Regions:
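Active-site helix of classical SDR
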Residues: 2, 38-39
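A short, exposed helix-loop element centered on a Lys and neighboring polar residues
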Residues: 2-3, 48
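Active-site-adjacent segment of SDR/Rossmann-fold oxidoreductases
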Residues: 8-9, 27, 49-59
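Residue(s) in the substrate-gating loop at a strand-loop-helix junction
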Residues: 22
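Active-site loop immediately N-terminal to the catalytic Tyr-X3-Lys motif
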Residues: 27-34
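Conserved catalytic Lys-bearing alpha helix of Rossmann-like short-chain dehydrogenase/reductases
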Residues: 39-47, 61
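C-terminal helical subdomain
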Residues: 63, 83-121
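Short, flexible catalytic-loop segment of classical short-chain dehydrogenase/reductase
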Residues: 66-76, 80-81
Length: 144
């Protein structure tokens, strides 16, 4: 979609792009094997690149990085155990959407939604990776 709409945004001298990424790249999560985390990392870096490359043309691009968000996704994907995570870990989808819109309108490149998710992302940077991976493995075993 960016490829399709970016040229007209450049011609108009104005545009806003939101890419829905995830908290996953910021925290260790061995249960997200495969391509999920790498794709989300790409979305974040892609958003940063578009934002910086086209900022002088009036275009802002934001990567919105929510944690667990209440939608039908987890149940439809057969991730029933994730859907049973404690309520305090979840965000409302309307809140995530509103925060994402506010972020792009204010020129913020990366948004980690919610205080708890920001705390998790910061904590993952501070704790040695060997410890955070061990914690993630333990939590994953409990959930499945």
């Amino acid at each position: 979609l960016t490829y399709l709409f970016l040229p007209s945004m450049v011609n108009n001298g104005y545009g806003r792009i939101i890419n829905l990424a995830s908290l996953a790249p910021f925290i260790p999560s061995p249960d997200m094997a495969g391509l999920y985390r790498p794709v989300k990392i790409f979305q974040i870096k892609f958003s940063e690149s578009i934002h910086l490359q086209y900022l002088d043309k009036g275009i802002h691009c934001s990567a919105v990085c929510p944690g667990l968000t209440r939608t039908e996704f987890h149940i439809a994907a057969g991730m029933d155990e994730v859907a049973k995570a404690p309520k305090w870990l979840w965000m409302d989808s309307k809140t995530v959407a509103r925060q994402g819109l506010d972020a792009v309108m204010n020129g913020k490149m990366i948004l980690i939604n919610g205080r708890l998710n920001k705390f998790f992302a910061i904590l993952a940077k501070i704790i040695p990776q060997s410890i955070s991976r061990s914690i993630a493995r333990t939590l994953t075993k409990r959930a499945y």
